[in-house]
């Protein structure tokens, strides 16, 4: 079965870009046409890009490396967590702290602190503390969990990043590139696709589109894991014929096809410019920031 179909893309509104006046000229080769002042993305190129990204994830996972899902914009937060957890991978969906990759040794210390507090909750340590001390530790834990909960079990740097919105996740991209970590990213018509190893042209604002892209990447991880498990079984049963692995790499999502006549440019509906955050280098204040 196909990784994704044209019908899937159309139903999810993947083809809708931004208003023409907001485009990035470097996206020209991915744009099919313009209608009602909106750029329409070439879905034939999107399908090819998705297949390439899918294979990259399968290869990375089959080598025993992890995938880090990154999407901190509101539309992406829930889907990023859900799909990363579904395939057993890691995610950042609240805020990218500067140094998350390039200063991973410091991040690991914060993760150790989070696990220590969790252990204190269950081993009876809290029984010997005052209410004020307990409240302070619980507050610390909550804020660590909020920023780092999605990578709590990540022991090493990821093998590949999957990113929603390259403009918002600019720091994550810069860190990954400096470390030579491959990047898969959804690039909308207002984004710069340069420097992305596997750019996927598509709508990075619509929840349905984000869900489709993220689900496909998660399915690639699951398929690779299933194939790995099958190989183990085959090695244990060398004298028996192996069965068909038959994994469905994509579960169809039944959504309404968006009508151009009822379409409101996303720049007008929700506002395209987002407040920039100061995500410089990670420090204790960053980890406990309520943002």
Curated annotation (Swiss-Prot):
InterPro entries: Ribosomal_uS2, Ribosomal_uS2_bac/mit/plastid, Ribosomal_uS2_CS, Ribosomal_uS2_flav_dom_sf. One of its GO terms (cellular component) is cytosolic small ribosomal subunit. GO terms for biological process: translation. Residues 270-291 have a biased composition (Acidic residues). It comes from the Bacteria. CDD domains: RPS2. Gene3D superfamilies: Glucose-6-phosphate isomerase like protein, domain 1, Helix hairpin bin. Residues 235-291 are annotated as: Disordered. Pfam families: Ribosomal_S2. PROSITE patterns: RIBOSOMAL_S2_1, RIBOSOMAL_S2_2. This is Small ribosomal subunit protein uS2. It comes from Treponema denticola (strain ATCC 35405 / DSM 14222 / CIP 103919 / JCM 8153 / KCTC 15104). The gene is rpsB.
């Amino acid at each position: 079965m196909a990784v994704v179909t044209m019908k899937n893309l159309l139903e999810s509104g993947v083809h809708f870009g931004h208003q023409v006046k907001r485009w990035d000229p470097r996206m020209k080769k991915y744009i099919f046409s313009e209608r009602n002042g909106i750029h329409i993305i070439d879905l034939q190129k999107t399908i090819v890009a998705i297949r390439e990204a899918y294979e990259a994830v399968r290869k990375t996972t089959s080598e025993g490396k992890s995938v880090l899902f990154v999407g901190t914009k509101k539309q992406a937060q829930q889907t990023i967590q859900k799909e990363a957890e579904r395939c057993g991978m890691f995610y950042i969906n609240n805020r990218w702290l500067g140094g998350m990759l390039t200063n991973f040794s410091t991040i690991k210390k914060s993760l150790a602190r989070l696990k220590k507090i969790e252990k204190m909750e269950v081993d009876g340590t809290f029984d010997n503390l005052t209410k004020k001390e307990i409240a302070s530790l619980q507050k610390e834990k909550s804020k660590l969990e909020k920023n780092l909960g999605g990578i709590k079990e990540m022991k090493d740097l990821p093998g590949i990043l999957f990113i929603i919105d390259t403009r918002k996740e600019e720091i994550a991209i810069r860190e990954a590139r400096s470390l030579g970590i491959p990047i898969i990213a959804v690039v909308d018509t207002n984004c710069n696709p340069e420097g992305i190893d596997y750019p996927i042209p598509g709508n990075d604002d619509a929840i349905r589109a984000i869900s489709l892209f993220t689900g496909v990447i998660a399915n690639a991880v699951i398929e690779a894991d299933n194939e790995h498990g099958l190989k183990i079984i085959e090695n244990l049963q060398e004298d028996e014929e192996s069965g068909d692995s038959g994994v469905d790499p994509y579960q169809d999502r039944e959504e309404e096809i968006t009508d151009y006549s009822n379409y409101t440019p996303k720049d007008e509906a929700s506002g395209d410019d987002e407040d920039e955050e100061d995500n410089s280098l990670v420090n204790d204040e960053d980890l406990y920031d309520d943002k």
